[in-house]
A protein has these predicted regions:
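Post-cleavage N-terminal segment of exported redox proteins
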Residues: 2-57, 193-201, 229-249
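Electrostatic cytochrome c docking/interface patches
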Residues: 45-69, 81-84, 88, 113, ...
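A generic secondary-structure signal for well-formed alpha-helical elements
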Residues: 39-46, 71-75, 80-84, 136-137, ...
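Sequence context of c-type cytochrome heme-c attachment sites
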Residues: 40-54, 59-63, 78, 94-107
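Long, low-complexity, intrinsically disordered N-terminal extensions of eukaryotic proteins, enriched
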Residues: 2, 6-13, 86-93, 99-102
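Surface-exposed patches in mature extracellular/periplasmic domains of secreted proteins
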Residues: 76, 142-148, 237-246
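The canonical Cys-X-X-Cys-His
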Residues: 64, 70-80, 129, 226-230
Length: 249
């Protein structure tokens, strides 16, 4: 047995000492691995799971997402729960490709100085988010997150929100002409439950929350937009109805 092992090792030395054979071997292994991993994708119509409930962002949520990107939140927070036991037990169901199919660019992140935010929606109250964004250490004394108090005093500039929807449609987000046309009205309606056009807004964006998010009625701030975006994350797919096996291929 020992002699056989030595014989295999001796034969392998021939490859190690011959650079051409070594390169050929490396390329062969890469080719096999590529066929195993990439090949099946050519037979799939889509790599996105079939789920119920996903919809494009509302104008307010899209404005909040733009602020999220602008302030670099993705540098410290991920939006990607991996299928590992510790992550699933802490954050919830692992992330689905369908949940980020309308993100351009996606917000999966690459670093977790802070917790993952993929399912932060409805986990805390609006007041909690406002307080945390204004002064993180008032909630978590050990936090290294900077404060964003200016969001509460900065009026949201939504004059070009229709153009943002139109730009997203060009990269594949299925916004309709009606949604683009009423973008400004829909943004105003989402933060004001007394707005006459709330019913029309909810028809265009099912399950969208309608309320004043920053606790400052009568004024639409950047805080409204960011909190509205955060409160939506991870809430669109009902995992009580989601069937993992239906997406097996």
């Amino acid at each position: 047995m020992k002699g056989r092992a030595m014989s295999v090792f001796t034969r392998h030395q021939v490859i190690e000492k011959n650079s051409i054979l070594l390169v050929i071997g490396i390329l062969l292994v890469i080719a096999i691995g590529g066929m195993v991993e990439i090949g099946p994708l050519f037979y799939l119509k889509s790599t996105i799971e079939k789920v119920e409930g996903m919809r494009p962002y509302t104008p307010l949520e899209l404005a909040g997402r733009n602020i999220y990107v602008r302030e670099g939140c993705y540098l410290c927070h991920s939006q990607m729960i991996r299928p590992l036991r510790d992550e699933v037990e802490r954050y919830g169901h692992f992330s689905l490709a369908a949940e980020s199919m309308y993100d351009h660019p996606f917000q999966w992140g690459s670093k977790r100085t802070g917790p993952d935010l993929a399912r932060v929606g409805s986990k805390y109250s609006d007041e909690w988010h406002v307080t945390h964004l204004m002064d993180p250490r008032s909630i978590v004394p050990q936090s290294v997150m900077p404060g964003y108090p200016f969001l509460a005093t900065s009026d949201l500039d939504y004059t070009s929100i229709a153009a943002h929807l139109r730009a997203n449609r060009k990269v594949g987000v299925p916004y309709t002409d009606e949604q683009i046309e009423h973008a400004v009205d829909d943004l105003r309606a989402q933060v004001n439950p007394d707005e006459p056009k709330v019913a029309e807004f909810q028809k265009r964006y099912p399950k969208a929350a309608v309320r004043d998010f920053d606790g400052n009625p009568g004024r639409i701030t950047e805080m409204d937009a960011l909190v509205g975006y955060l409160q939506m994350l991870g809430t669109l797919v009902d995992f009580k109805l989601y069937d993992d096996k239906a997406n097996l291929r």
